[in-house]
Amino acid sequence: MSTNKALNSQTQSSKAEHVFVIEDDDGMRHTIQVILKLLDYVVHAFKDPNEFLAIDFLEAPAVVITDMKMPSMTGIELQAELLARGQNIPIVFVSGQSSLEQGLMAMKQGALEFLVKPFSREDLIKAVVKGIAKDMERLQALNRSEKVALLLKTLTKSELEVFKLLEKGFNNQEIVQATGLTLYTAKNYKAKVMQKMGVKSLAELLRLKELLLNM
């Protein structure tokens, strides 16, 4: 198992694709490690989910593969704990004993895949590829949201007020009525907001709103 120091060092690599394997069965854990390491994934293996939860890993393209039934914690409980911490990393569940109810619960909470033991090498790889792709999309969206937040900080107090009204779909006359500004000043603030936020249309501005809602 990697140490925290090694884990953080590896996570900082922009090209590394990480797989966190939580499996109490030594043989299964080893098999998954071997398969994925041969494909150049950075694999972090844990026998106990509490060991996994104890690490402080950085944001990176990653996917979690976890057994559904373990002595100290179920896969559902691990998933819930990650969500509570704001860690929305894609999760692949593996199990040979889980009920249909557990599988449905996992998928309802956002699980990526549910593999029933014994699963094929191909199914495992497909699930990991899918998970990494999904996490890369999440990180890209997060980066865009952070950029939008930085752009918002460049707005003056008055410009920010106009920005919030534009988000609500206010037209020029409605902005004038809501703020008491003259029509000329309202249009001027609107132009500055569009320029600073790097958009050319109200539709683009509304897309920025969606990014902010997902932050």
Which residues does each PLM region occupy?
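Acidic catalytic/metal-coordinating carboxylates
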Residues: K47-D48, T74-L78
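Conserved acidic segment of CheY-like receiver
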Residues: S13-G27, I32-L36, P49, V64-I65, ...
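Acidic, metal-coordinating helix/loop segments flanking the phosphotransfer/catalytic sites
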Residues: A45-V63
